[in-house]
Amino acid sequence: MGERLKGKVAIITGGNSGIGASTGQLFAKEGARVVLMARREEQGQMVANSICDDGGEAIFVGCDVGDHDSVSRAVEKAAAAWGRIDLLFNNAGGGAGSSFPDEPIEEWQRVIHTNLTGTFFMSQAVWPHLVNAGGGAVVNMS
């Protein structure tokens, strides 16, 4: 286990698979307490359990980043669990399901809402916690 993130609490959106899950594992290996957030609870809990099985500290908190109330509740749960938030890794998002020339505007709007508005909601909700922690970091994936 590393020490670069020892004592830090990191929220990772889209933490139930892919880059988010791998980032959660890496942060935990560096000593962070990891809060994985995603909509798919079963997958997210499996990743959290895997991190804990490997000697790290992780919890899963269900969250739809495109829903302001869901984000507010999830961030407060994260802060209550470990008393602080030091890092936000905005990773939740996705692409359209159809090819560009055929993409309906509704699909485009859904992608924009999750990928951009969700990043805004999360960053805004976490910001006061970063200030209270004396600083921190927000990382936005694209």
What are the residue ranges of the model-derived segments?
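Conserved glycine-rich Rossmann-like NAD(P)H-binding loop of the short-chain dehydrogenase/reductase
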Residues: 30-46
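The beta1-alpha1 cofactor-binding region of Rossmann-like NAD(H)/NADP(H)-dependent oxidoreductases
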Residues: 41, 62-74, 105
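Conserved NAD(P)H cofactor-binding loop of Rossmann-fold oxidoreductase domains
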Residues: 91-96
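A short, exposed helix-loop element centered on a Lys and neighboring polar residues
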Residues: 123-124
